[in-house]
Amino acid sequence: MQQIIVIEPIVTDRLILKALVKEDASAILHILSDRDTAWWSDDFKMRSLDEAIDFIDWGNEAIDVIHYGLFRKESEKAIGYIQIKLPKCSGIKDARELGYALSKNFRKQGYMSEAVNAICDHLFRDESINRITLEILNNNLPSLGVARKCRFSYVDEPIEKKHKRFLDDQPVDLYVRRRPDTDMSLAA
C-alpha cells in the first residue's frame, strides 16, 4: 500500500512553498527550458507543456520525489521549485537530497536560500531525518552560494567516490546539513 504524503504549504517572509498544479506548467516549462538552468540540472531540458505537466504529476505522486513550487507572496506564478528525493529514490532512510531551479528573473535576490532554509527546517521536524544533502557541480557558483548561506558543509571525498552526473558523467561535490541537535561526537 502506497503511503500518502501531503505536500503541506510552507510560508516564509517572502515566499509560499506549495504543491505545483497543472496550471503551473507554463511557468515550470519556462524555467526548465532555459538552457542555462537546464545545464546545471541532472534532469533534461524541458521541451513541451506536456513534459512540464508530467514533471508536476511525478512530483505530486510522492513516490520517489516531492516537488515544492516557489511562489512569491504577491504572485500566483511559480518562480522555481525544490525537489526532495525520497528514500525510494535515494535508498537512504535518514537523509533527503534536494535539487532546485529558479527562474533567471529572480536569481541573486535570496529567494532560493530562503526556500532551502525553510525546506530544511520543515524536513528536520521529522526526527528520522538526520541530514539533508546537495550534490553540486564545482563550477555552479550560484548553488555553491546557496549551500554556504544555508549552512551546508562540503564533504571531502576522493574523486573515485564522488557521484557522477547522469547527464555527462561529471563528478559532483557533496554538501551536507545535519540536524541541528545532532551530536557529532556520537557520529564517529
Stretches found by the model and what they are:
Residues 1-35, 67, 71-188:
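Acyl-donor (CoA/ACP) binding surface of acyl/acetyltransferases
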Residues 48-50, 63, 166:
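A short hydrophobic/aromatic micro-motif that marks alpha-helical segments and, especially, helix-coil
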Residues 36-58:
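Conserved GNAT-fold acetyl-CoA-binding loop/helix
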Residues 57-69:
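A short helix-loop-beta-strand connector motif used in the catalytic cores of GNAT acetyltransferases and
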